Amino acid sequence: MTTLRIATRKSPLALWQSEHVATALRQHHPGLEVVLVPMSTRGDEVLDRSLAAIGGKGLFLKELELAMLRGEADCAVHSLKDVPMELDAPFVLPAILERGDPADALVSNLYATLQALPLGARVGTSSLRRQAQLRAARPDLELIDLRGNVNTRLAKLDNGGYDAIVLACAGLQRLGLEARITARLDAPEWLPAPAQGAVAVECRGDDARIHDLLAVLDAGRTRACVEAERAMNRALHGSCHVPVAAFARWEGEDLFLQGMVGSASDGRLIHAEAHGSPDATEDLGRRVADGLFEKGAAQLLAEL
């Protein structure tokens, strides 16, 4: 019997996503034994500073990648929005699963919508992208850093530290917490992080056997969308240090990509969009990035 070892973070959401991948692999490969290898990452351990301040979302990957290099795991499961735009050699993403809900969620115990929040309400989020869009919609809000896993963030809200918090819909849904969604923050008015809602599986590119086992899970239509979003982000040199949003959807046989760059300090937002072929996602992403640059994105990004 063949055994496949999946490196995963220890958070409830990461474990859910890894078990979701494991279940799908068992269905596609009867007789395959799939085991999880839970690991702690620096991104999980340092919670008193923003991700931008401690090195970015790549901190969620490094320990898992080292486990693959040491032969302790065969692959790793990630939220694709946490995966850097450029992977270090020899790593590849043979599988991007069908995307979950890409939207953000406003979660509040007292107020039904973003506009219903009282003047100066305390809203928790550490995402610069979310902060920029919150500032644009409600300049009066007091935005407060909020780190930790989904349950930790909800507990901080429930303990009275915030009037509302902003989380990803997909994370709440995957943990059976959809009832906590107070209001959806949806495209086109509110854009998600590039690849938000998508789960990816990473492995060594030089391990053909593992690559082939994983590739059966790849969802082509989702891959086209998130590759266009990530191409735009790459062209902008975006990271968690930069308030960048992107969302691609299918329109007939083409993709429609919306992009945004914002300022978390004053809520200025710049938008651009374009249609393109799903066979030319790099070009589509670059064209939307060019549209953002033409509207002043370079100047805005230089101020960060």
From Swiss-Prot:
- Tell me what this protein is called: Porphobilinogen deaminase
Q: Which organism is it from?
A: Xanthomonas campestris pv. campestris (strain B100)
Respond yes or no to whether keyword Endoplasmic reticulum is given for this record: no
What HAMAP family would the database entry show? Porphobil_deam (MF_00260)
The family assignment reads: Belongs to the HMBS family.
Pfam families documented for this protein? Porphobil_deam, Porphobil_deamC
Q: Per its Swiss-Prot or TrEMBL entry, what cofactor is needed?
A: dipyrromethane
Which top EC class is given?
transferase
Additional facts recorded:
The porphobilinogen subunits are added to the dipyrromethane group.
Which reaction equation describes what this protein catalyses? 4 porphobilinogen + H2O = hydroxymethylbilane + 4 NH4(+)
Record-listed E.C. numbers? 2.5.1.61
Note describing how the cofactor binds: Binds 1 dipyrromethane group covalently.
Q: What is the lineage of its organism?
A: Bacteria, Pseudomonadati, Pseudomonadota, Gammaproteobacteria, Lysobacterales
Keywords tagged on the record: Porphyrin biosynthesis, Transferase
Is Metal-binding one of the keywords?
no
